[in-house]
């Protein structure tokens, strides 16, 4: 294992400065959370599942905030997994916490998630993870044992469930998408993402982004985004420093941009604009004030994929382009919740050939997706233009 430098620099989306709450612990203040929905329950077939998902993601975001503070104050270990991606006790704590919350009301629905308990055990992180989970779990869970928490983590692991090539209902969780952003600091984004899939259709999703720019006047920072099939996409502030849920749900939509040179683009931080097919048509600039005729605006948005989906679904960005690399796999949890949030906000998500993302291609595990060429996430209005440009540029790629 390697210890990562928590001071490593990564590019971040340029928002107004985020309010930094005082170091007052948010522990135990989660109890007042109420998963009220912004639409009538009878309109949402999966409203019970959605209410639980909202509450679980909100609790998970509180765990992230506390762990992040303790990481930098106590210099706890940050280890690397075999693929050289960083992982912290927050990743495992979130997975355990969400798994426990979901299993209380929906024990028969399997969970597909990123982590398993191997790294917790191997790096002596068990007691730290258990402590964080106990502090955020539902009332009555303060007697959780180490075995309970480790089992909850492994419930989402690779070997927990086999789908036998049949349509299924299951949760998809990314405990922290953008761990590098979690480690970087206040400007970088990271997301807790949870979706429910029923017979290969994503029917609901909840994303929590603790670093999303908030309102300094009330001490709030972060956002929750929910989507339910047929009910739209909605956002709400996370709890503020006093533990109150700030504000009401607000429905959000993709932007209305119809001109490619006026669009705002996001790309994966590990990829360059020059590696993407649209670079043959437009140059890219990160400076909005002086764009030339053949330039598009590129928004430096770190870290992970889900924050880019959040940008498009909320109308802050027009397009997110991801190129599939032959040497790397694309994980379902990096996209599932983002797909429904963008769809319900009026946008569109396909592979580079215009086909919808198929979550069942990995028939036995549902952990991988195989989008042809890559993923296009757009406001819908620009989608066909982008696909045409990709198609015309493909012989030269």
UniProtKB/Swiss-Prot annotation:
Pfam families: Inositol_P. It comes from the Eukaryota. Its cofactor is Mg(2+). GO terms for cellular component: chloroplast; mitochondrion. Coiled coil: none annotated. It comes from Arabidopsis thaliana (Mouse-ear cress). One of its GO terms (molecular function) is metal ion binding. Its EC number is 3.1.3.7. Mg(2+) 1 binds at residues 114, 174, 176. Mg(2+) 2 binds at residues 174, 177, 334. Adenosine 3',5'-bisphosphate binds at residues 179, 305, 308, 334. InterPro entries: Inositol_monoP_metal-BS (IPR020583), Inositol_monoP_superfamily (IPR051090), Inositol_monophosphatase-like (IPR000760). This is Putative 3'(2'),5'-bisphosphate nucleotidase, mitochondrial. Belongs to the inositol monophosphatase superfamily. Mg(2+) 3 binds at residue 114. Its main location: mitochondrion. It is found in: Mitochondrion. It catalyses: 3'-phosphoadenylyl sulfate + H2O = adenosine 5'-phosphosulfate + phosphate; adenosine 3',5'-bisphosphate + H2O = AMP + phosphate; adenosine 2',5'-bisphosphate + H2O = AMP + phosphate. AMP binds at residues 305, 308, 334. Keywords: Hydrolase, Magnesium, Metal-binding, Mitochondrion, Transit peptide. The active site is at residues 91, 179. SUPFAM superfamilies: Carbohydrate phosphatase (SSF56655). It is an enzyme of class 3 (hydrolase). Phosphatase that converts adenosine 3'-phosphate 5'-phosphosulfate (PAPS) to adenosine 5'-phosphosulfate (APS) and 3'(2')-phosphoadenosine 5'-phosphate (PAP) to AMP. Residues 1-16 form a transit peptide.
């Amino acid at each position: 294992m390697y210890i990562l430098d928590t001071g490593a620099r990564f590019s971040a989306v340029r928002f107004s400065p985020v309010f930094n709450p005082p170091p007052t612990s948010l522990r135990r203040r989660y109890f007042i959370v109420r998963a009220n929905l912004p639409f009538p329950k009878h309109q949402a077939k999966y409203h019970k599942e959605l209410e639980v998902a909202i509450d679980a993601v909100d609790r998970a975001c509180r765990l992230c905030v506390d762990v992040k503070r303790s990481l930098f104050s106590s210099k706890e270990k940050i280890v690397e997994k075999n693929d050289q991606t960083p992982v912290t006790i927050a990743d495992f704590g979130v997975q355990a916490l969400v798994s426990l919350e979901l299993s209380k009301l929906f024990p028969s629905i399997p969970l597909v998630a990123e982590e398993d308990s191997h790294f917790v055990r191997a790096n002596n992180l068990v007691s730290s993870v258990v402590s964080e989970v106990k502090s955020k779990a539902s009332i009555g869970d303060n007697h959780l044992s180490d075995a309970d928490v480790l089992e909850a983590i492994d419930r989402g692991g690779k070997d927990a469930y086999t789908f036998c090539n049949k349509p299924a209902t299951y949760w998809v969780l990314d405990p922290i998408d953008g761990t590098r952003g979690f480690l970087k600091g206040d400007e970088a984004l990271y997301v807790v993402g949870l979706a429910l899939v029923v017979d290969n259709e994503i029917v609901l999703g909840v994303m929590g982004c603790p670093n999303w720019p908030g309102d300094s006047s009330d001490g709030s920072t972060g956002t929750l985004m929910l989507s339910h099939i047929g009910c739209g996409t909605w956002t709400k502030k996370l709890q503020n420093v006093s533990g109150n849920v700030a504000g009401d749900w607000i429905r959000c939509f993709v932007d209305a941009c119809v001109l490619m040179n006026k669009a705002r683009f996001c790309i994966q931080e590990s990829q360059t604009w020059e590696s993407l097919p649209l670079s043959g048509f437009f140059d890219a600039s990160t400076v909005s004030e002086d764009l030339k005729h053949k330039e598009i605006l590129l928004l430096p948005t770190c870290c992970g994929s889900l924050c880019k989906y959040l940008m498009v679904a909320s109308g802050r960005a027009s397009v997110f382009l991801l190129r599939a690399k032959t040497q790397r796999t694309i994980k379902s949890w990096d996209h599932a919740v983002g797909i429904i949030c963008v769809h319900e906000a009026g946008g569109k998500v396909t592979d580079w050939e215009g086909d919808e993302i198929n979550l069942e291609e990995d028939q036995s595990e549902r952990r991988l997706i195989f989008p042809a060429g890559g993923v296009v996430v757009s406001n819908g209005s620009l989608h066909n233009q982008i696909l045409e440009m990709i198609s015309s540029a493909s012989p030269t790629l």
